[in-house]
């Protein structure tokens, strides 16, 4: 996102006790649902009620995305034993619910955590960095084509930065949530960072926990009122 002054920042909170009860209930039924999946399912449902959250800016014009996808990073172990990260992009469809969303995420994570597996995004990045002089030149060309709306569909499908939502679960590495900028490259309009649980100081029930969600939003894709309605739907 080239206009950094067009970003808004807010911290939302998810009641961990409510989420935990639901997770435990489903676990007794034989279904394992992570916290991040619950957040994503709530976000997706709220988007269906407030579709403008899925718009993006390209070349100073507002566009409505014709699909919904989410990008996130997972840790994996390479074939040589080194720890590494890989980006995943998962597409949701109108008929998806918490269970189909959970299944899609589980399948994507399982496939991309295989040591010998490089997803298409990994392969694209490996190609770029295979020739020392190529990355800078090619990235410059790709960014220019992106700004002009000339980027081929194949590259957009490979890019985790062309997404409805980018989310990171820092609680998984016992880290506080952060405000992560929306990327200069791509069409990410909202970035959500989940942090490690904190005491529920808002209600004064310090023995109960909340999950902080640090949110960075492109203010150009919808009005403040529309953002407020969207986050009310998420809650």
What name fits each language-model region?
Residues 1-235:
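C-terminal catalytic/motor cores of large multi-domain enzyme assemblies
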